[in-house]
Amino acid sequence: MRLKVGLLGGGSWGTTVAAVVSRNAPIQLWARDAETVEGINRDHENRKYLPGITLPPALGATSDMAEVVAGADVLVMAVPSHSFRSVLEEARDHIRPWVPVISLTKGLELASGKRMTELIEDVLPGHPVGVLTGPNLAREIMAGQAAASVLSMADEIVVRALQPLFHSGLFRVYTNTDLLGCELGGVLKNIIAIAVGMGDGLGAGDNTRAGLMTRGLAEITRLGVAMGGRPETFAGLTGMGDLIATCTSPLSRNRHVGVELGKGRPIDAIIAGMNMVAEGVKSAPTVMALADRHGIAMPIARDVFDVTQGKRTAMDVFRGLLKSSVGDEAHPG
């Protein structure tokens, strides 16, 4: 029996994953925006988020959530963190028991500090939960360029059963049972990407970028391990791999925010000019709260938090780097 997949969310990444899955299984995408739905069904294009890219004819879309959720053997969540819980609550009345729910969202709930898989467990108890995450830039994948990702679930049997749904051609999908570590890597790298972008916006060089990425990965790993993740996870695709892609690609939303901050633009103006969400800006306050709760020093992430909150400028932060004391490489700072 072929599994039917329902995907909630009509953004660039959700549309990309839906296109990949459509090669392996029947899939239907839900989006609130009527123009997005019409464009996918009539023209096989998501003009708002993936203009100029032709989608597979097998991919259909609808604004009827009940239709998508009720018929799904697997449900994929591709909505921003700020609306994740409310969309789950809408879906709750229509989902069948024990249907696996996979998150594509790399963020935290602002009010609770919870990861998206924790929200799934809150709203849909008893459903297997997982994430698809890694160094995955939507436009590159839609252009047919090779990429690797990770499907992570706590249950090894379930994750291996679902792996073939997402693995397709040059889009290679590995499995990992460290759900917490994989999910946190995708969240935390966004903040480091903003820091790297600030350096790029200020005209810093490759040495600065390499230093920020390396020290940033150390911060990610320290917090991730303190929260229960496995150290090796953060050296893999969902940690270092995702960090490299997000910190270096001109397609990265979080890096773009950092670049504009480095140029001196205010955060509100930057966000207002984007039609997609930069999760790192929203996650920064929650990540700082988690770091404080676990007693983990994250100086780079804290600098990003200060700048995105308007407490300091990118120039102030980078000047401060030159004045901070240094010690053993294994220590924070």
Swiss-Prot record:
<dbReference type="InterPro" id="IPR008927">
    <property type="entry name" value="6-PGluconate_DH-like_C_sf"/>
</dbReference>
<comment type="similarity">
    <text>Belongs to the NAD-dependent glycerol-3-phosphate dehydrogenase family.</text>
</comment>
<keyword id="KW-0594">Phospholipid biosynthesis</keyword>
<dbReference type="GO" id="GO:0051287">
    <property type="term" value="F:NAD binding"/>
</dbReference>
<dbReference type="GO" id="GO:0008654">
    <property type="term" value="P:phospholipid biosynthetic process"/>
</dbReference>
<protein>
    <recommendedName>
        <fullName>Glycerol-3-phosphate dehydrogenase [NAD(P)+] 2</fullName>
        <ecNumber>1.1.1.94</ecNumber>
    </recommendedName>
</protein>
<keyword id="KW-0547">Nucleotide-binding</keyword>
<comment type="function">
    <text>Catalyzes the reduction of the glycolytic intermediate dihydroxyacetone phosphate (DHAP) to sn-glycerol 3-phosphate (G3P), the key precursor for phospholipid synthesis.</text>
</comment>
<dbReference type="InterPro" id="IPR011128">
    <property type="entry name" value="G3P_DH_NAD-dep_N"/>
</dbReference>
<feature type="binding site">
    <location>
        <position position="253"/>
    </location>
    <ligand>
        <name>NADPH</name>
    </ligand>
</feature>
<dbReference type="GO" id="GO:0005975">
    <property type="term" value="P:carbohydrate metabolic process"/>
</dbReference>
<feature type="binding site">
    <location>
        <position position="138"/>
    </location>
    <ligand>
        <name>NADPH</name>
    </ligand>
</feature>
<feature type="binding site">
    <location>
        <position position="254"/>
    </location>
    <ligand>
        <name>sn-glycerol 3-phosphate</name>
    </ligand>
</feature>
<keyword id="KW-0443">Lipid metabolism</keyword>
<feature type="binding site">
    <location>
        <position position="106"/>
    </location>
    <ligand>
        <name>sn-glycerol 3-phosphate</name>
    </ligand>
</feature>
<comment type="pathway">
    <text>Membrane lipid metabolism; glycerophospholipid metabolism.</text>
</comment>
<keyword id="KW-0521">NADP</keyword>
<dbReference type="Pfam" id="PF01210">
    <property type="entry name" value="NAD_Gly3P_dh_N"/>
</dbReference>
<feature type="binding site">
    <location>
        <position position="32"/>
    </location>
    <ligand>
        <name>NADPH</name>
    </ligand>
</feature>
<keyword id="KW-0560">Oxidoreductase</keyword>
<keyword id="KW-0520">NAD</keyword>
<keyword id="KW-0963">Cytoplasm</keyword>
<dbReference type="InterPro" id="IPR036291">
    <property type="entry name" value="NAD(P)-bd_dom_sf"/>
</dbReference>
<keyword id="KW-0444">Lipid biosynthesis</keyword>
<dbReference type="GO" id="GO:0046168">
    <property type="term" value="P:glycerol-3-phosphate catabolic process"/>
</dbReference>
<feature type="binding site">
    <location>
        <position position="279"/>
    </location>
    <ligand>
        <name>NADPH</name>
    </ligand>
</feature>
<feature type="binding site">
    <location>
        <position position="134"/>
    </location>
    <ligand>
        <name>sn-glycerol 3-phosphate</name>
    </ligand>
</feature>
<feature type="binding site">
    <location>
        <position position="189"/>
    </location>
    <ligand>
        <name>sn-glycerol 3-phosphate</name>
    </ligand>
</feature>
<feature type="binding site">
    <location>
        <position position="253"/>
    </location>
    <ligand>
        <name>sn-glycerol 3-phosphate</name>
    </ligand>
</feature>
<dbReference type="InterPro" id="IPR006168">
    <property type="entry name" value="G3P_DH_NAD-dep"/>
</dbReference>
<feature type="binding site">
    <location>
        <position position="106"/>
    </location>
    <ligand>
        <name>NADPH</name>
    </ligand>
</feature>
<feature type="binding site">
    <location>
        <position position="277"/>
    </location>
    <ligand>
        <name>NADPH</name>
    </ligand>
</feature>
<dbReference type="Pfam" id="PF07479">
    <property type="entry name" value="NAD_Gly3P_dh_C"/>
</dbReference>
<dbReference type="InterPro" id="IPR013328">
    <property type="entry name" value="6PGD_dom2"/>
</dbReference>
<feature type="binding site">
    <location>
        <position position="242"/>
    </location>
    <ligand>
        <name>sn-glycerol 3-phosphate</name>
    </ligand>
</feature>
<dbReference type="GO" id="GO:0046167">
    <property type="term" value="P:glycerol-3-phosphate biosynthetic process"/>
</dbReference>
<feature type="binding site">
    <location>
        <position position="13"/>
    </location>
    <ligand>
        <name>NADPH</name>
    </ligand>
</feature>
<keyword id="KW-1208">Phospholipid metabolism</keyword>
<dbReference type="GO" id="GO:0005829">
    <property type="term" value="C:cytosol"/>
</dbReference>
<dbReference type="InterPro" id="IPR006109">
    <property type="entry name" value="G3P_DH_NAD-dep_C"/>
</dbReference>
<dbReference type="GO" id="GO:0006650">
    <property type="term" value="P:glycerophospholipid metabolic process"/>
</dbReference>
<feature type="binding site">
    <location>
        <position position="12"/>
    </location>
    <ligand>
        <name>NADPH</name>
    </ligand>
</feature>
